[in-house]
Structures are given as C-alpha cells and as structure tokens.
A protein has these predicted regions:
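S-adenosyl-L-methionine-dependent methyltransferase catalytic module, highlighting the catalytic core
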Residues: 167-175, 185-309
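Short hydrophobic/aromatic beta-strand or adjacent loop that forms the aromatic wall/cage
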Residues: 39-43, 160, 300-306
Length: 313
C-alpha cells in the first residue's frame, strides 16, 4: 500500500461548485485510516462560496493507489449487518408500484436484490467490476458519466456514500437531473461536513473523501442543478459503527502540542505530568459530552441522508 502511494499523482483544483480558484487552507492530515504518514492532504474552503474540498487531490487516474487491497471486500459480502442496513435504507424510499431505481455505487448489487424482492425494477452502476454479482440485476461498470441511461427514466436514484468520493459532483448532479423522472427523487448518503466527526475529530476518510458537503452547500448544489431539498436526515443509524466525534478532545489537545500524527495514531507519545493530567480531563470530556444520539439531535452527527426533488418551474 505505502509503495503504491509513492506513485500517487496529485492535482490542484478549483471549486467544483462555483469554479473559483481562491481558497483558504483549513487543516492537513495524512491517511489516518491506513496509517500512511508520508504525505499530508490539505482540506481547503472556497473563499467565494464556502465549499470544502481536497486540494491538491489524487488524480482520477491514480485514485486506485489510495485504496487498500481489502477496501472493497466488505462491499461485496452481504452479511447480517448489511441486510439490516438495507432495511434502513429502504425506509427512505417512496412506495411506488413497479418503480425503476438506479443505485450509484451498487457494488455487487446486494441492496438492489433486496429491492427487487419488493417489486422494484433495479439498475446499478459501479466503477469497480466485482467478482461477486447478484443474479438478475442490471449493472453497468464504470463511472456514471461514462455510462448512458434514458432521459426521465428513473423514479428514484440513490447513492450511498458515493458523492464525497467523486471528482466532479456537479457532473453527477447534472446527469442525475436528466435521467430522473420529473416527479422522481435523488436520495443519497454523505458525510456531514459540519459534524464533530468530520470537522473537529479529523475522522473523514481522507484522501478517499475529496469533497466535504455541508447542508448549505447541498442546498446550493440543488439550486444550481435543478433540484430542491425535500428533506435532510441527520443520522448515525445506517452503519453499525456510528460516525461519532468521540475522541475529538483528545486528538485536538495532542495536536495543539504539535505531536505528530504518527505518534497520536500509534499511541506512542510522551507527556509531562501536567500534560498527562490535562489529557486525562480530555478523555473525561470525550466520555461525558459526546454521544451519537446527542450528535443526531443537534445535527452534529457524521452522516446525512439527503432527499432531493426536481425543481420543475
């Protein structure tokens, strides 16, 4: 994994939402998930519109270098946890007889098979061709902009944890508007860029996440590409492990002492007696003040489910 990242190609980019090249740096982190500390990636915020994104970011041609060999394994194994998630995801869908649905980032089609058994006509698209594929599910492989679908064809389009990974969300919004029925819904799960998990605890999956959407930014994307926001749900329930900000007090305290990320993640730092006492109180604050249910209540949890309707003038 680390040797592959040495060949990573990075590119500076303008804001996908407004096109401005003016931004300010918010913070930089290495690949904490896979403990690759060779390079730190910068999260920036557009000065013009406020959208947050990675710049420089891995180029599209080199994105495969930042995915661990086992990264996609769980996407193709439909276990009890996944089945429970399918039930929760389906609750966001409308009740439509013989409705046509497209799932972007469908992996092997497990969610679509679940929906097919409930009467949906199912289609999928995924940029990774998996070894495992559900029988009877129409899946096209490649990025959405590389695959064609009829205009006004789908009643519902879903994308569960996809939009934060794509280089040009604007292109996706534009295409989805064209292939979605005028009364259709675009339903997608994304990390909440305003959450404790994302903004303050440094837990975003950087550099695989390259866009960091906030509610006001979603509303602006919707406006620009012919949608209106029907509903935003702030939830930690879709995954067995909540996207919680727990640990943020500890992490931010250690970073304030200029302790390198490699020592923080590997828990190999030394503190003076005074700093140990302060660190102990940070752990207490994390335990007492941060809880997934409270994060949901105050819209500070790590995930949002967004439902967009087409804005027909």
């Amino acid at each position: 994994m680390k040797s592959r990242v040495n060949n990573l190609s990075l590119e500076k980019t303008d804001c996908d939402l407004c096109g401005s090249g003016n931004y300010k740096n918010l913070y930089s982190v290495p690949d904490l998930r896979f403990k690759n500390f060779k390079h730190e990636y910068s999260v920036v915020q557009c000065i013009n519109c406020g959208h947050r994104y990675l710049s420089p970011r891995p180029s599209k041609d080199s994105m495969h270098l930042i995915y661990h060999d086992n990264y996609y394994k769980n996407r193709n194994e439909v276990d009890l946890k996944q089945k429970n998630r399918f039930i929760l995801q389906a609750d966001y869908l409308p009740k439509i007889a013989n409705g046509k649905i497209l799932d972007i980032g469908c992996a092997g089609g497990g969610f679509l098979k679940f929906l097919k058994n409930k009467g949906w006509k199912c289609y999928g698209v995924d940029f990774i061709k998996t070894k495992y594929k559900e029988k009877g599910i129409n899946i096209k492989y490649g990025y959405l902009p590389e695959r064609s679908f009829p205009k006004l064809f789908f009643n519902v389009i879903t994308a569960w944890g996809v939009m934060e990974h794509v280089h040009e969300p604007s292109v996706y919004f534009e295409i989805i508007n064209k292939i979605l029925d005028n009364k259709g819904l675009f339903i997608f799960l994304i990390p909440n860029g305003d959450s404790l998990w994302s903004r303050w605890a440094f837990k975003e999956d950087i550099p695989r996440h390259i866009h960091f959407f906030r509610p006001k930014i979603i509303k602006e994307y919707a406006r620009q590409y012919g949608f209106k926001v029907h509903k935003i749900y702030y939830t930690n329930k879709l995954y067995s492990r909540p996207a919680s900000g727990k640990g943020l007090f500890k992490r931010r305290f250690l970073r304030s002492l200029d302790i390198p990320w490699v020592k923080i993640i590997n828990n190999s730092f030394d503190l003076s007696m005074l700093k140990k006492i302060q660190y102990y109180f940070m752990k207490i604050f994390d335990a007492l003040l941060i809880h997934p249910k409270l994060e949901e209540l105050f819209h500070l949890c790590g995930n949002m489910v967004v439902i967009l309707k087409k804005d027909i003038k």
